[in-house]
Amino acid sequence: GYWSRGLGDVYKRQITDGVKFASTLGTIMPVFSSPLLQYMIKALPFSSIMKILLRHPRNDRKMIFAAMYFGNPSKKIPFMGVNNYVDEVIKLEKLFSDGRNFFYNTFSHVDINLMCVFNRLVDLGLEETVSHKTPHIYAYWEKLKSRNSYQNGILNYYTDKEKELLSEFYKNNDSSVLKAILEQIDKKL
């Protein structure tokens, strides 16, 4: 029953909802985003970090914030998602190879979610991963970018502060993760 599994199991299940670490596009994006997140955390004043450490409800997140502020764990984290990401890209490429315009043929929440995922790839300098040997995903992404909702709901959200932060991040960001992803795509396609 409920109590025989222990509260730790229940807590773990509530947080992960049964999804393994970096196993889906939705769980891989935070892994790929860790260098950007660390860049943003390091830009915070120490007092903000202390507020997070004192007030954040999740201890695991507190530890991540502290590690990113005082250390440099994000250099290796993105590589943990490369293989699963490439597998997900290949699945999408096969799905869109039937000529459909959207995930379910008509624009849906899945397309909105993928729009957000692909836009995050742009933010991270990884957009090439959805066009390298994947013409069907590339065509789909171009359709998504041409929608007014992309401009109004995503691009118009960025303020000058976000644009400046991303520009600074790009200056310090190496392309080793991009290279690793493209190499895996080359191997698997």
Regions found by a protein language model. Give the residues of each.
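Single conserved hydrophobic/aromatic residue that forms the stacking wall/gate
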Residues: 1-11
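Short, thiol/selenol-centered motifs that function as redox-active sites or metal-ligating centers
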Residues: 8-10, 111-112, 147
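GST-like fold's C-terminal all-alpha helical module
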Residues: 18-142
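Long, positively charged, glycine-interspersed low-complexity recognition regions
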Residues: 131-189
